[in-house]
């Protein structure tokens, strides 16, 4: 980034207001600005900066659609085109897979009509493979061996019938989303490429920094801007992978990129792997033991607070974030966490799951009773214990007297337990139930000054994130977009919350950095510790 800042300043000068820097992620810009400021004693008009996904969104007339709504819209088209009686409950989770496939189609600029060609005319499909690369061609050929005329079954016939309609579903789905002004990511990207007018772009120069593997839509985008003389490219690599070893697999994509989009920096800037480095390998019996090694590592590398930002803790397994936060010693004054904290690792997530389980699988409508297992689980939760002084004695009493199927009236011993154990039916009532409980829990964190450590800040954020997520589902239910069974809602709530991360707030350019592997792109540090550098974690597959 320092090299990029120096080169840009030399080529463009101190007025970069008509320039935008595009990074694979947002983090690199904060460090870039620091380097750019050091290039001159005079004021500099800083360039705009954004991630590649943000740039596509700004160039699009459509908005990125809510993932849940996108599935609901696909379901409407699916029902109309196939005349299927399949419920949204059964469709939802494989509908997500279908959208993911459509996303891949668009990001790779595949001709959808050819891809979804009629399987009945198998010979024509096999003969027309120009749109596939060699690996894709072999995979498709192997797949279609199972669809010979002699070996067809009822299930295969059903699949062939569905495949026959996928092209129509794909086009109609895109048309419907366009009318609504929304899109899934691949559709949004593809529409930008197809409608791009380079003469009407906001910036004079688009500076692409530190990319590696490009999909077809990104490659096309780069090409369009390059042809319009509006693009500059900075690649971060090492000659070890491009020159010293012929056809090194790690250099495959960067070699391709360098050929298509030449680097603004000379090759001499990228010969660093041959320089001496001090590397230690440390074995540990468990992953948590690796986290507990952090204090010793910090003491050996950190002498002043000014050096904190020169150190990075990189988590190859991001599930280690919680033990790492607990292991950071007090002498580290500032910590910047560049990765979101998984909401699934917070108390509110387990509480919501327990509450949903209580109201769905834990309540027997026929008998009007709860099951002991679900009641016990929610009574043992820390939030329930904090909000009700009766929770612990009630749980002990149920266990002692073997009350396997308690009545709701036996559990309502105070205001909070009344709210908790009032049976709810229907998906709207369940959403109301969850938001009411979250509001009660939020009262525990009302006195912000009393809870100023990093974990309580996280838990407050997790409550807010959960509350807004449930409200989003409620809005879709109210408008009729989402109509599912209660057990599907339970799985959906769990899935959406599991996929959510809580952002950390703070000054990103100071303090010791804690990050995942992807967040390290474009960044350099004096000292790095890689945790969980194990097979199965780096890489996760291969």
Give the location of each predicted region:
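Nucleic acid-machinery interaction/catalytic patches
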Residues: 1-542
């Amino acid at each position: 980034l320092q090299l990029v800042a120096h080169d840009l300043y030399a080529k463009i000068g101190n007025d970069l207001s008509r320039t935008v820097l595009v990074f694979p992620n947002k983090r690199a810009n904060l460090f870039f600005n620091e380097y750019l400021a050091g290039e001159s004693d005079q004021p500099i008009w800083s360039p705009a900066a954004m991630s590649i996904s943000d740039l596509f969104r700004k160039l699009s007339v459509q908005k990125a659609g809510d993932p849940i709504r996108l599935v609901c819209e696909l379901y409407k088209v699916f029902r109309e085109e196939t005349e299927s009686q399949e419920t949204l409950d059964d469709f939802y989770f494989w509908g997500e897979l279908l959208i993911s496939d459509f996303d891949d189609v668009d990001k790779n600029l595949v001709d959808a009509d050819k891809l979804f060609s009629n399987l009945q005319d198998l010979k024509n499909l096999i003969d027309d493979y120009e749109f596939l690369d060699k690996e894709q061609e072999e995979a498709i050929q192997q797949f279609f061996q199972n669809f010979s005329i002699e070996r067809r079954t009822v299930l295969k016939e059903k699949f062939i019938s569905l495949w026959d309609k996928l092209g129509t579903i794909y086009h109609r789905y895109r048309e419907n989303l366009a009318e609504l002004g929304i899109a899934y990511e691949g559709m949004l990207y593809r529409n930008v490429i197809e409608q791009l007018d380079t003469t009407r772009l906001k910036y004079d120069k688009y500076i692409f920094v530190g990319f590696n593997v490009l999909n077809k839509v990104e490659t096309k985008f780069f090409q369009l801007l390059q042809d319009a003389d509006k693009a500059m490219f900075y690649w971060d690599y090492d000659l070890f992978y491009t020159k010293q070893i012929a056809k090194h697999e790690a250099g495959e994509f960067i070699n391709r990129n360098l050929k298509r989009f030449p680097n603004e920096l000379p090759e001499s800037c990228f010969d660093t792997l041959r320089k001496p480095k001090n590397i230690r390998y440390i074995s540990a019996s468990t992953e948590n033991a690796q986290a507990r090694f952090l204090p010793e590592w910090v003491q050996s590398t950190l002498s002043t607070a000014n050096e904190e930002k020169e150190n990075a803790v990189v988590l190859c397994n991001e599930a280690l974030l919680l033990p790492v936060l607990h292991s950071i010693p007090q002498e580290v004054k500032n910590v910047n966490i560049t990765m979101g904290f998984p909401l699934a690792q917070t108390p509110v997530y387990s509480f919501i799951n327990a509450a949903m389980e209580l109201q769905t699988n834990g309540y027997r409508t026929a008998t009007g009773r709860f099951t002991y297992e679900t009641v016990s689980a929610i009574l043992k939760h820390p939030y329930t214990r904090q909000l009700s002084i009766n929770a612990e004695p009630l749980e002990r009493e149920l266990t002692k007297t073997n009350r396997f199927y308690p009545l709701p009236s036996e559990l309502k011993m105070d205001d909070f337990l009344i709210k908790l154990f009032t049976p709810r039916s229907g998906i709207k009532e369940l959403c109301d139930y969850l938001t009411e409980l979250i509001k009660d829990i939020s009262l525990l964190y009302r006195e912000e000054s009393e809870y100023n450590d990093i974990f309580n800040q996280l838990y407050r954020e997790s409550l807010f994130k959960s509350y807004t997520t449930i409200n989003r589902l409620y809005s879709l239910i109210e408008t009729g977009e989402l109509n599912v069974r209660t057990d599907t809602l339970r799985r959906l709530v769990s899935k959406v919350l599991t996929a959510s991360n809580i952002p950390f707030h703070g000054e990103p350019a100071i303090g010791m950095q804690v990050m995942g592997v992807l967040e390290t792109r474009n960044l350099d540090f004096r000292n790095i510790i890689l945790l969980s550098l194990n097979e199965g974690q780096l890489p996760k597959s291969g």
